[in-house]
Amino acid sequence: MARIAGVNIPDNKHTVISLTYIYGVGRTRAQEICAATGVNPAAKIKDLSDEQVELLRGEVGKFIVEGDLRRDVNMKIKRLMDLGCYRGLRHRRGLPVRGQRTKTNARTRKGPRKPIRK
C-alpha cells in the first residue's frame, strides 16, 4: 500500500479512485492531479513506479488535505459561532444551517425525537 498525505492508498484500485481515499480529494481533484503529473488515471497504484508515486505525493501536497483541512473547516465553524451570526447560532443549536425546513424532517441534524413532557 502506498502512503500519500498520511493515508494508506489501496493498491488494487485505479489511481483516480485510490486518491479519493484522501480527505479533501474527490473525483474531480483526483483527475486534475493525475493530469498534472501525467499518471494514467486507469492504472492501478501497484503498477505505478516509485517516481510516479512521488509525483502524486508532491501534487497532493500542494492542496490542503486531511488534518489541516479538517482543522480549517472546524475553525471556520467556530468563528461563525463566536460571531453569533445566524449560521453560527444554527451550528450552536444543532439545527440545519442552509435554510432547510425543520417542522418536519431534519431528524439527522436534530437527533432522535424527545418525548413531550406533560
UniProtKB/Swiss-Prot annotation:
Keywords: Ribonucleoprotein, Ribosomal protein, RNA-binding, rRNA-binding, tRNA-binding. SUPFAM superfamilies: S13-like H2TH domain. It holds the Pfam family Ribosomal_S13. It comes from the Bacteria. InterPro entries: Rbsml_uS13_C, Ribosomal_uS13, Ribosomal_uS13-like_H2TH, Ribosomal_uS13_bac-type, Ribosomal_uS13_CS. The keyword rRNA-binding applies. GO terms for molecular function: rRNA binding; structural constituent of ribosome; tRNA binding. The keyword RNA-binding applies. GO terms for biological process: translation. GO terms for cellular component: cytosol; small ribosomal subunit. Residues 94-118 are annotated as: Disordered. Belongs to the universal ribosomal protein uS13 family. Located at the top of the head of the 30S subunit, it contacts several helices of the 16S rRNA. In the 70S ribosome it contacts the 23S rRNA (bridge B1a) and protein L5 of the 50S subunit (bridge B1b), connecting the 2 subunits; these bridges are implicated in subunit movement. Contacts the tRNAs in the A and P-sites. PANTHER family: 30S RIBOSOMAL PROTEIN S13/40S RIBOSOMAL PROTEIN S18, SMALL RIBOSOMAL SUBUNIT PROTEIN US13M. Part of the 30S ribosomal subunit. Forms a loose heterodimer with protein S19. Forms two bridges to the 50S subunit in the 70S ribosome. This is Small ribosomal subunit protein uS13. It comes from Stutzerimonas stutzeri (strain A1501). The lineage of its organism: Bacteria, Pseudomonadati, Pseudomonadota, Gammaproteobacteria, Pseudomonadales. The gene is rpsM.
